[in-house]
């Protein structure tokens, strides 16, 4: 049986070993363990952990650290097992602190820092996988690290702008944290600029507007306000506009069909909103209704294009005429 290789002090001293250099801890692993010592030692001094528990904790972390460094492209499983270890430590320490009434701010900060560092290493290693970013977001959300969560979502979207689930997560996070529909709306607008016909993002944006309309309706009707602009919003006008623009970006009727099931489902959640009622009332004629809306939007876009081209031609003609007059002078 091997002797404990680490004494709870501010200095890490590796045990004697007959292993060659490739089997010993890397300098990075050793440094990380040294950085964790103050955290674990503070819990021991506060009598939240016993000496034996603290030593076992360090031994476990050494094993987990070495395994990550020894593996070329360590599998995700190794990172998740390390994260589970930190989670178990956190639960144990919180339970002991509640039981004893003891506080240990230094240890808490150290444990949180070590956990965040591990997650940062994880998303660096698996940055090409959107699922890895979602797992990190789940962790940050569970710890109420709101600012860090927003920063992480921004980084994830910069790497994976085509992943619709990340846009949905970012929009729901903004709405939950700020309580402002405009913030979530801005996220969806950014997502649709990059993915103009993505059905998941489009349905998320429509659902946001229907929810907004449904929330405003009781207040508006209760106050008896007769404002055409507000009435348009309450009737689902913004949701109608989002749908129209999304349909205009779709390449063909196949994409329109792919939207139908989700649209009916979303409309069913807000059946009191007039626009949702219109969607639901289409029945088997929904596809034809959507195709007609798409054609109308395409006609609007063509009219806008022609108008812009005409204005540009007039500007060029005016500029050319001005140049000729200057030359004559």
Annotate the PLM regions.
Residues 3-329:
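Polyampholytic low-complexity alpha-helical segments
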């Amino acid at each position: 049986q091997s002797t404990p290789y680490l004494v709870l002090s501010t200095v890490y001293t590796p045990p004697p070993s007959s292993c060659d250099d490739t089997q010993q801890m890397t300098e990075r692993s050793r440094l990380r363990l040294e950085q964790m010592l103050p955290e674990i030692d503070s819990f021991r001094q506060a009598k939240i952990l016993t000496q034996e528990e603290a030593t076992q904790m360090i031994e476990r972390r050494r094993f987990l650290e070495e395994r990550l460094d020894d593996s070329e492209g360590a599998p995700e499983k190794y990172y998740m097992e390390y994260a589970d270890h930190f989670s178990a430590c956190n639960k144990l320490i919180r339970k002991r602190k509640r039981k004893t009434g003891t506080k240990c701010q230094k240890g808490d900060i150290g444990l949180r820092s070590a956990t965040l560092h591990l997650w940062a290493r994880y998303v660096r290693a698996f940055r090409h996988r959107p699922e890895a970013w979602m797992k990190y977001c789940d962790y940050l959300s569970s710890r109420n690290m709101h600012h860090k969560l927003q920063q992480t979502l921004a980084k994830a979207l910069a790497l994976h702008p085509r992943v619709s689930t990340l846009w949905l997560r970012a929009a729901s996070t903004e709405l939950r944290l700020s309580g402002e529909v405009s913030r979530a709306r801005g996220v969806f607008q950014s997502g649709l600029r990059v993915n103009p016909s993505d059905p998941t993002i489009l349905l998320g944006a429509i659902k946001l507007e229907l929810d907004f309309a449904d929330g405003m309706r009781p207040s508006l009707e209760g106050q008896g306000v007769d404002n055409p602009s507000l009435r348009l919003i309450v009737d689902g006008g913004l949701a109608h506009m989002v749908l129209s623009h999304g349909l205009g970006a779709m390449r063909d009727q196949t994409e329109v069909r792919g939207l139908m099931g989700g649209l009916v489902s979303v409309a069913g959640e807000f059946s009191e909103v007039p626009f949702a009622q219109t969607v639901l009332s289409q029945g088997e004629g929904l596809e034809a209704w959507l195709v007609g809306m798409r054609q109308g939007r395409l006609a609007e876009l063509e009219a806008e294009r022609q108008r812009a081209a005409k204005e540009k031609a007039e500007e060029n003609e005016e500029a050319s005429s001005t140049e000729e007059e200057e030359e004559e002078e």
